[in-house]
Every structure is written in structure tokens, then in C-alpha cells.
Amino acid sequence: MKYTYPNEKGYFGVFGGKYLPETLMPALEELEQQYLKIKNDGDFKRQLLYYLTEYAGRPTPLYFASRLTDVVGGAKIYLKREDLLHTGAHKINNTLGQVLLTKKIGKKRIIAETGAGQHGVSTATAASLFGLECTIYMGEEDAERQALNVFRMKLLGAEVKIVKAGSRTLKDAVNEALRDWVTNVKTTHYIIGSALGPHPFPMIVRDFQSVIGEEVKQQILEIEGKLPDVIVACVGGGSNAIGIFYPFIEDTQVRLVGVEAGGYGIETGMHAASINGGTIGVLHGMKSYFIQDEWGQIESTHSISAGLDYPGVGPEHAFLKEIKRAEYITATDEEALEGFLLLSRTEGIIPALESSHAIIKAVEIAKSLDKSKSVVINLSGRGDKDVQSVKNLLDTDKELYERLLSRLKEKYGV
């Protein structure tokens, strides 16, 4: 299959587009023109490669998780170690690219929204590296869950604005950041943290994140001599997933599996699985799947992981689901905790709760395949930021902890 999306209007099929006030259209058009000109500029590419390599720590390893593979029994499991990047997650791939873009455009200030705080930290990091003024918007509830990341951003010189409106989470932080951008568009570039928002943002973020999949393709061919059978990644807005999926879209023999946050279960209504539990609508400048009521009002979401706790999904994922090129499943909070403990105990790697959703489902898939097959998990971030909240949860819910431990013993003997 030949894949050439988005089209010139910024659509992936019916998804995507630019649903924003007229006042922002010139800024979006200018950004698109500048991006398309700059992205193939030799000097820009050299600079970006330099910082990704020397500063962020690319390429990241594609690590064969031999002990995890043994206890699961089935396909070989590989981990794409985005958790080893500077700042601890895949987010830095995008922020370095976009901050370099900001410099090229000649703007002096950057703003961003953040949920788990990872994108905020990596934006503040890149701003500090290039000497740009930086403001980060964060929902009050997320700021409480991720107090350390709030301090990290301040430490890096960013101003952190806590958003108390609405559900006080990522959706509200995006609203405030968009308001700021409308007001200060002449001096300010908005670095969206995921592959969502109005065109050209989903395309820009995807392009900067696709270094993940490009490396995987090269690495797996060197190790296995063939492409992987399955690639699994967690999906909130979807930037780590689109980053690893995109270079494989035309390789139709490779199964692409996105794992959404099932929260307490889709049937409870307390989840953040937009594709599995949402409907098509418009929010934050794009048409995609959202968790909304029958009148299009956005409903509250729930996930154990702040980074997946967003009521929508990037338009390219909506499209990949529509054309059946990728499949989207869910993992509950409890399943994610199982993945979190399992990887910690088998490989000595504490994963982010976001990535833990992908781990547990990849394990189920690997178990069903024979030993000649391979499954790649995008380990999108490390779990340091989650250790305190997992500790608090398991300290208060002893029954849950016991249940998880006995499940690990029964299923994997660990």
C-alpha cells in the first residue's frame, strides 16, 4: 500500500483538519509553510541529528528481553528503549525538533501543555538548551499527581501555570495553551506534546517521532534479519505510537497494535479509550474520536497514568483504525500495574505507567505466538515519575497488591 497522508488540507481521510478560529489560520498556514521548507533543509537536519545523538542519547537500543520472553513463553519480546533518552521519555524527540524549528522561524517564546509532566519537562529542557522563554500549562489535578515534575520544570527555568478550570487535567491545559497562542502568536510557538491538534501539528509531531520506528526497522533487520511480526505501543494522544508505527505502515505484514487506557473498564465509563469507547467529534482543532456525550460535550476521563488521561486521540490513529491498518485494544489500570510489576521483576526495568499498558498486552500477544516470531514493545518512558503514586496506591489497597503478586506468581512464576 502507498501511504501519503495527510493530504494538502491536513486530513487523514475524514480525520484531522483545522477547526480553529479564523484568527489562528494565518499562524497555522505560516507554520506549515515554514515547516515544509525547513524539514528538508540540510542544515536543519544536521543540527537536529547532532542534538538527538549528542544531547538526547539516540539511537536508543532495541533490547531483547530474554527473561521476560522466557517467563511468558512464546514470541521473542524486544523493547525499544525510549526510556533511556535524556529526560526519560520519547517526548524529547519532538521538543528538540520543534525548538529548533522555533529558532529557525525567529520566535523567542515557547508554550506547551503537559499531562504527566514529561512533555513539560522536555519542553523546558529544550528551551533552556536554546535560551528561549518558556511557559507550561498543566491541569491542577495532574500537577498534584506529578508534583516533582512541576518542580523540575521550574528548576529548568520555565514558568508553570496551573489550570484550575474544568476537569483540571490535560484537556484544560490544552485549552489555556491555545488561548495563550491566539494572544501571542507573533512571538510565540506552541509545542503540542502529542500527535494531535490542528494541522500541521499531527504531521510535525509524527515526523519528529518517527525516528523511533526508523531505528527499530534498521535494528530488527540487523538482529533478526526480518521485520517484526507485531509492534505494540500505548496510545493516549498517540505520539509514541505513531512514531513507531509510521515507518511500518506500508509493511502490511507487520501487525500494529495500539493500547488505550481502559481505566476501570470501558463498561464503567471511567476510562480514557477514545477509539474503543468514544465517537467522532471535534476538539482542540481536529476531527477525531473523543469521549463525549450524545451532544458532543466532552466527558471526564480516567486513567491511572496521567499521560494517557486525555479525552481524544490523534487523527492519524483514528484513520489507521478506519482503514484497518492498525488495531486498538485496551488495558485496564490493574492490567497496567501488572505490566509495571512484571517488567520490573523480570528485566530490572521500571517502566512508565503509560508504557505498562503496552507491556501487558504485548505479553498476551507474544504468548499466543510461536518462538520464531517477534514482538516489539515501544517502552516510551521510564517509571521514576510513577513510583511514588504506585507506592501510595498499593500501600492503601493491600488487597490489590496481594492480587497482583499472586497473579505474577501464577502466570509467570515470578
Curated annotation (Swiss-Prot):
<dbReference type="InterPro" id="IPR001926">
    <property type="entry name" value="TrpB-like_PALP"/>
</dbReference>
<keyword id="KW-0663">Pyridoxal phosphate</keyword>
<dbReference type="Pfam" id="PF00291">
    <property type="entry name" value="PALP"/>
</dbReference>
<comment type="pathway">
    <text>Amino-acid biosynthesis; L-tryptophan biosynthesis; L-tryptophan from chorismate: step 5/5.</text>
</comment>
<dbReference type="GO" id="GO:0004834">
    <property type="term" value="F:tryptophan synthase activity"/>
</dbReference>
<dbReference type="GO" id="GO:0005737">
    <property type="term" value="C:cytoplasm"/>
</dbReference>
<dbReference type="InterPro" id="IPR006654">
    <property type="entry name" value="Trp_synth_beta"/>
</dbReference>
<dbReference type="InterPro" id="IPR036052">
    <property type="entry name" value="TrpB-like_PALP_sf"/>
</dbReference>
<comment type="function">
    <text>The beta subunit is responsible for the synthesis of L-tryptophan from indole and L-serine.</text>
</comment>
<comment type="similarity">
    <text>Belongs to the TrpB family.</text>
</comment>
<comment type="subunit">
    <text>Tetramer of two alpha and two beta chains.</text>
</comment>
<protein>
    <recommendedName>
        <fullName>Tryptophan synthase beta chain</fullName>
        <ecNumber>4.2.1.20</ecNumber>
    </recommendedName>
</protein>
<dbReference type="InterPro" id="IPR006653">
    <property type="entry name" value="Trp_synth_b_CS"/>
</dbReference>
<dbReference type="InterPro" id="IPR023026">
    <property type="entry name" value="Trp_synth_beta/beta-like"/>
</dbReference>
<feature type="modified residue" description="N6-(pyridoxal phosphate)lysine">
    <location>
        <position position="91"/>
    </location>
</feature>
<keyword id="KW-0028">Amino-acid biosynthesis</keyword>
<keyword id="KW-0822">Tryptophan biosynthesis</keyword>
<keyword id="KW-0057">Aromatic amino acid biosynthesis</keyword>
<keyword id="KW-0456">Lyase</keyword>
